[in-house]
């Protein structure tokens, strides 16, 4: 009986190595996803700050004729230009701004390369953020 057990165990030699390698690969994939998704959250936070700043810059462009008539309204063309100008120094982003007399809407998008998810075929991620701002009386 002892000899039968030894013969059986010799046939399974190295099976733990394969299981260990598969477990290590799975852990690396989870770690890669965590690193890249964490990076995506940081990029989104930065984009959100940029969009907020650009929308606020646009919301400061008031229509002077409307002010003289006692109304608080934006000059849409100047508001859109100011919002896009506020984003002009930010590298690697795509920006879109729309303005009406009531508000400014800004959307920014950035594509960035992944670090470890590239190993499973996901070479880059796209993250976007948007913000709205409207003028208010003090």
Stretches with model-predicted labels:
Residues 1-77:
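Alpha-helical assembly-interface signal, strongest on the long, hydrophobic N-terminal helix that forms
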Residues 2-3, 115-138:
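Low-complexity, S/T/G/P-rich flexible repeat/linker segments used as non-globular hinges
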Residues 20-21, 45-46, 78, 116, ...:
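Solvent-exposed, flexible loop/coil residues
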Residues 28, 89-101, 123-134:
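Short, surface-exposed, charge-dense and proline/glycine-enriched linear segments
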Residues 32-34, 83-84, 120-121:
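Intrinsically disordered, low-complexity segments enriched in polar/charged residues with Gly/Pro
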Residues 55-108:
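Short amphipathic secondary-structure patches
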């Amino acid at each position: 009986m002892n000899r039968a057990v030894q013969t059986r165990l010799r046939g399974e030699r190295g099976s733990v190595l394969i299981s260990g390698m598969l477990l290590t690969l799975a852990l690396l994939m989870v770690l890669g996803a965590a690193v890249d998704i964490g990076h995506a959250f940081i990029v989104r936070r930065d984009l959100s700050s940029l969009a907020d700043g650009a929308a606020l810059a646009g919301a400061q462009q008031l229509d002077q004729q409307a002010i003289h008539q006692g109304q608080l309204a934006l000059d849409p063309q100047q508001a859109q230009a100011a919002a896009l100008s506020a984003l002009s120094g930010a590298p690697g982003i795509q920006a879109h701004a729309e303005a009406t007399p009531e508000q400014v809407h800004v959307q920014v998008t950035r594509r960035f390369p992944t670090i470890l998810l590239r190993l499973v075929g996901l070479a880059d991620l796209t993250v976007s953020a948007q913000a709205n701002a409207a003028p208010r009386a003090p």
